[in-house]
Amino acid sequence: MEAKVEEKEPEPVENAGPDAPVRLTPMMEQYIEIKAANVDSLLFYRMGDFYELFFDDAVAASAALGITLTKRGKHLGEDIPMCGVPVHAADDYLQKLIAKGYRVAVCEQVEDPAEAKKRGSKSVVKRDVIRLVTPGTLTEEKLLDPAQANFLMAMGRTRGDGALALAWIDISTGTFRVAETTPDRLFADIMRVDPRELVVADSAFHDEELRPVFDLIGKAVTPQPATLFDSAAAQTRIQHYFNVATLDGFGQFSRPELSAISGAIAYIEKTQISERPPLMRPEREHEGGTLFIDPATRASLELARTMSGNRDGSLLKAIDRTVTGGGARLLAERLTAPLTSPKEIALRLDSVSWCLSEQTLCEALRLELKGVPDMPRALSRLAVGRGGPRDLGALACGFEAAGGIASLLDGALLPDELAAAREAIEKMPAGFAAHLDRALADELPLLKRDGGFVREGYNSELDEMRALRDQSRRVIAGLQADYIEETGIKSLKIKHNNVLGYFIEVTANNSGAMTDTDEAKSRFIHRQTMANAMRFTTTELAELESKIANAADRALSIELAIFEELTAEAVAHADSIRAAASALSVFDVSTALAVLAEEQGYCRPHVDDSLSFNIVAGRHPVVEQALRRQAANPFVANDCDLSPQRDGGDGAIWLLTGPNMGGKSTFLRQNALIAILAQMGSFVPAGSAHIGVVDRLFSRVGASDDLARGRSTFMVEMVETAAILNQAGEHSLVILDEIGRGTATFDGLSIAWAAVEYLHEKNRCRALFATHFHEMTALSEKLERLSNVTMRVKEWDNDVIFLHEVAKGAADRSYGVQVARLAGLPEAVVNRARDVLHQLEAGETSGKADRLIDDLPLFSVMLQQEKPKPQIQAKDSELANAVAAISPDELTPREALDLIYKLKELAGKA
């Protein structure tokens, strides 16, 4: 955005008496008019080199940004609050506001103040909103996370049957996808994509069935007029946006999908106003093509971020070895949407296997990939008029790296996925790449208005203008030397002032050489006579002066024209540029997963359509790396076999018992993560893995209160368990941890017992079920597909040692008291707990609390002091020393008898 001179603010339209309300100035009236059309956004109102905010916007922005709140004029007798941010730093402030959930309308001066003055002294410079900045429509580099997609999502719904669909777009890369959904899957499908903003029809926003989903999403939901989602008008809107006469080449879309696509495009047009980001054609996702993971499972497994919202500690962070922004985003996309087709999974695994077999070549590929900038985002910024020279430079660097990669791969026998990627790279616009290389300078400025980004020699007129601009002194000195030689006046000078501009000055005594002849008079034009000097100009000098004065402006004008020319060429090649960039991301992900597999000792999983789930020596990918960083004991690998026990049978259930801190939750999670890694196309942390495709993954591991919705921990647990039991099928994988622990013991045991029976008889799926209710191990005698396994421990000197090994069998104790002692509970509390436990285990309470209180007085803990640790006394030490000094083999019978009496005496003194 180029700075413009701020116009002088006109006087108020009317100045009434001191007791009457003061009318607003024309400028403030303009502000209020524009603000009225953007009530849901903070208005950045351009005034010279600042964006100003007024009234409530100023109060909100000053608090959010930590900037000074001041005032400007009055309205209805009250001061008008005002704050402002400099234009050159606007992106930094926008980033903070967007992060806090605000939307911003950017209002620019759309004419020069000089033009406004021509309409009258009270005229205000024309302004208009050129863009609405919202969380889902960002393109600026500073506002985006290079490793994360920035999706805008729209929900479409048809009248009558209420069918639903979702369309999501990342305008920073052009990605555009659409898929049908259902009310019960809606929240899960939204959270899988994890959009920054969700736009819905205002009628749907207030729908009682859907509103709970929108309440969970919160501020990210933006209601819009229902007309934007009209499926009947969608075809025309799509044709207009993509500038096509028919949608035959786009494939078939259902009515709700057309509604969602229409809503997404309409919102982009609304926020981008005059700009039209180039988008890929909408790609339809088919139901069942990806592994269904509900939001609770995504959260508990910490796939992309931890429960506390951090990326560090997540599975994505643990497996990410990518070196490009596009590769990082593709890896995240694959992790959050694993495949369910064994054939497609095998294609990805083949790519990783090839990279492992060609390590030298892959190291060279990764070196080239490190030089690949974020081409899709650079292209999008250029397309919407927010790009700069460095975005063109990013394309040039990307083309150069792509060329190097194509050379490295020349003649290589590649698997199908990588072969297709190489073909896309080879189709990049080589002519445009060469054009950029010729046109762009080596060092590029951030802003196009700074100039200097076109290479010397690319444009002859530009070179001339630059020479005049940068070398005016040398040019003037050369012309002065020519005039001295021509006139013979050695004291002749070419000077400059603000009145005459450039002029020739000679002493009065030497002026005759320039005035004595008609030829001289026509050559040297008299400008001014001084007391001791005369000043002249020439046609040549006047033209040079004009050129020098205009050279800087003309040079910048030429550069800006070249910039627009290159930008238009880039947009014209958008499809091939994006295809090449996507191909580079595929190579980045494949080589990164190969590096991960080699570094961490992962194996290639065998994935098919069976119900098998046999993991040998499996490890938790995140915990294992954390232990290595801490130089702690190595991770203990464990097997897990949930495969059918006979051909044609259903998957098995493992009932896992064992102590607290024994590793049950880690074991449960690691098997879920191994399934996800395998189906995203990655090698897995195991000795071997045979996995029948999982279509739905459910994990209920850990729970917390949902106070905002009035739900206790136990209620949250029951809701999540209900969702699992109602949705899991034979191809599902279910991970359940400690069901029923949030209520009374017998209630919890009953619920857990019934849930396991239901999983076995009704869902008939592969499942891991961890519990502290040891009574449940009896189910193995009743349920043929259920096996008991336990976390092994070793007891030593009243302590417990956790071996973290899974073994056949059942635990008979939870070792909770020992864990409490390890956690640092006061010794008196631990002792009291041990006594209570012994009484309960002995069955002496007969279920009556009063008898337990009688046997073990509760308040005695508070009255008794902790026993001091035994201290070694001097006499004890003397006795011990005497015993230690004895040499039994050297004593005579008489000496032995005397020694006994001596030791007895010492013992008596002690």
From Swiss-Prot:
GO BP annotations listed: mismatch repair
Gene3D superfamilies hit by this protein: 1.10.1420.10, 6.10.140.430, DNA repair protein MutS, domain I (3.40.1170.10), MutS, connector domain (3.30.420.110), P-loop containing nucleotide triphosphate hydrolases (3.40.50.300)
A GO CC term assigned to this protein in UniProt: cytosol
Family, as annotated: Belongs to the DNA mismatch repair MutS family.
Summary of the function given for this chain in its UniProt record: This protein is involved in the repair of mismatches in DNA. It is possible that it carries out the mismatch recognition step. This protein has a weak ATPase activity.
Keywords of the record: ATP-binding, DNA damage, DNA repair, DNA-binding, Nucleotide-binding
Comp. bias regions, Basic and acidic residues: 1-11
InterPro entries from the UniProt entry: DNA_mismatch_repair_MutS, DNA_mismatch_repair_MutS-lik_N, DNA_mismatch_repair_MutS/MSH, DNA_mismatch_repair_MutS_C, DNA_mismatch_repair_MutS_clamp, DNA_mismatch_repair_MutS_core, DNA_mismatch_repair_MutS_N, DNA_mismatch_repair_MutS_sf
Binding site for ATP: G658, P659, N660, M661, G662, G663, K664, S665
Membrane-spanning intervals of the chain: none
Organism: Brucella melitensis biotype 1 (strain ATCC 23456 / CCUG 17765 / NCTC 10094 / 16M)
Protein name as catalogued: DNA mismatch repair protein MutS
Sample GO molecular function, one term: damaged DNA binding
Cell membrane listed as a keyword: no
Disulfide bonds: none
NCBIfam families, per the entry: mutS1 (TIGR01070), PRK05399.1 (NF003810)
Region listing for Disordered, in residue ranges: 1-21
Pfam family, one: MutS_I
